[in-house]
């Protein structure tokens, strides 16, 4: 009885919420054995056929490659890809790949040579002799990834499991309609699958190993039981057929009764799951030394005349496989990669087969049915009842349609496995899975942008911290360099400061003169006497001819005679019109001073200028000026009462006459006598004389003022002295 209860507990299974039972449509392809497909003339191998970054290229255009040769290097999650056959690399360029939008990805294009030669293979038949790390590295470098549809690198998955794994589950459910790749593989290669399971169990060392398979695969179940007849470490669990029981979280719950938490992974509860196709690839990589270069693909649908499962080389164009299966396309023919619920329609047939390709479905028009028009949601909750992940698809639909990313995330849209059960039962024909895929892609893009922004912020903060550290270090160096100078340096600095202060004190010391004493002006007097002696020496250096008293000058004699006559006439007129006045001593003194000044000036001019010959032109001009002045004086004397002689005016007129005479002498000495110029100058002189006569007749004459006469005399003396000094400077 105890053994019966133990056996019951051992084979116990659980159930999950939701799920559907669509038509299976598996009998079209699971009845024929696996077969090989002829090599395609050209292969397109995308560098990224897994979850993660693409590997680093290790081949170039023109290289000859063999089957199994690595085309890229794999580090971390970068999984390498290998050549599916021998041939020549003709291009490395972007090419459309297995994607709903047929996005272009970098690919290696190889022209097959038809020889299909392998690289040298080295298998580990005794894999137990190798360490766990060596086995994981070999699995990774041989390009093994999850072949159930996710494409996660198997080596990374095994490495991440570590010692936490207590249960290893082999997924053999294959629940989606039409797909029979795993079913046929278990029928034909059960022993190799079990050997691969043993390798995985050797790496992980779990407490139990479970194989979950649906009850709609009787031939596969019988083959596995035959292989596992003597095995006590591996349990085969047959579960009811229900879609999507092949999901990782759903199968985990069925076999263990444990639920994976929201946002978590199966490894969080000590469970690791692998596909039967992955177990077979592990066996070939470890034991046979063959990288993954091919996989089983189901070719099915009413548009295919020879449905079945084939060994398809990775990189083979879809068109080549369908043509080998007898593809008969209709006018509006569609081809689906994957199953009818979780697959996607290919935009064209030139895309290559990759590691996650498990089925190519080519249905007829009647098989798929007429397309249904999308209607509004009626809130019937049928989608929520069918959801195996316990989500609310109708709420996620509204959040996705309204771009409410935060609410969609809060309602666990990331836990959606995109099984399509909600869309299958929707009476409004709403393609819910398409909305959910788009929403998850947008959320991932937002998170990626936030991650980049956070990384940029971290780099900026690190840079600011580095700059602050450098600044602090720089200030510390400056402070350490600013030490006190040595004692001898301080002595030198103090001496220099003392000298500067002494000089400043001497410069600012005031001059003190004692009371009752006279200042010492001997230096100033000596300087003045030196200047006088220098001036006398310069005068003595002139030729004796310059200092000789010139003889009589007819020109000056004529001018003086004219002035004398004019003064005589003016005095006669004043004497005849006015009574005699007593002699004024002040006027006499002024006139005497004026006469002395004129005499000194004439002597200086005579001593500084050489005697020149008489110029008839200048003589005529001077005579005309003298006559004009005489007429002016006569008119003033005849029209106005006689006035006393004004010394100021006389001095000014005499100075003007002397200036004109000097100017005319200079001009006469530099130019030859020209009769025309002489006539012009005489005319100008007569015009000036007439103008002066007119002005004299129109302006009144003011009586003479003794004070003004004295001032005028003083001004005349100053002007005479200034003229004499200027003459000396000019001569020097």
Curated annotation (Swiss-Prot):
It is a peripheral membrane protein. Residues 534-709 are annotated as: Disordered. Residues 645-665 have a biased composition (Basic and acidic residues). Gene3D superfamilies: 3.30.70.20, NADH-ubiquinone oxidoreductase 51kDa subunit. It comes from the Bacteria. The complex is composed of six subunits: RsxA, RsxB, RsxC, RsxD, RsxE and RsxG. This is Ion-translocating oxidoreductase complex subunit C. The lineage of its organism: Bacteria, Pseudomonadati, Pseudomonadota, Gammaproteobacteria, Enterobacterales.
